[in-house]
Amino acid sequence: MSQSAFGSAARINWKELYKRAIKLPSKRVGHAIEDWVASQSPMGNSPVIDAKTFDWVERLEKSSDVIRQELLALLDAQKHLPNIQELSPRQMNLSREDGWKSYFFYVLGHRIDASYRRCPETGKLLDSIPGLALAFFSVLAPGMHIKRHRGSYKGVLRCHLGLIVPEPRTSVRMQVADKMIYWEEGKCIIFDDTHKHEVWNDTDGIRVVLLFDVCRPLPRWLTAVNKFVLSLGGYLPEAHRLLRTQREWEARSAALANPL
């Protein structure tokens, strides 16, 4: 082969080739699948869903004071909850600051027993929610901004139960697609996180929600497929890393609370 041929090969933009040959077609297929899944669901492709659609919402909202008391006890005992980037490194793409803390209860079929022991009433309420896939306290520090992003799986809906919402409420907000949302203490917000969304806390106080995912309502056969796919997610390395890191944090916290 001539040197010019080698030179031509060297000039190939392999990154662009990968993008055109694999990444973009895969993304188009993924979006087509998402659109089809949405078409099978009673809420369609709506970015924000009426919380009254789910009968467990009223029960959860009525119990928000109990959950808040357990949260406050946790925050009082544990001044330094883990940063979400420690538990899930890919969240570094959204924020590299130390102002987004988390405390997990449930991850894709794996219950974190230590969290249930610390917050037993919260745990009982989570267990009563059908199709629970993920659950944690999400704590956002003053001045925090979570960049615009989207979830990767259409089979779940994301729920936020407002627990601590600082004033002015209009300065702590989330945009989902073209809709601006403001949290309210004791109220649930439900949205499809495959729509791009962004979060701001432009107040002097922390914002805390109980964040959890539930299975999207689908026909029975598709619900079975959806639950199977979610159960496989529990075996992914990232899920196991998150569980391991949270358990290590719990062990360190227990050791500090009960020194020899």
Residue locations for each model-derived region?
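Fe(II)/2-oxoglutarate oxygenase catalytic core
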Residues: 1-150, 221-260
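A short beta-strand-loop-beta hairpin characteristic of the jelly-roll/cupin
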Residues: 164-185
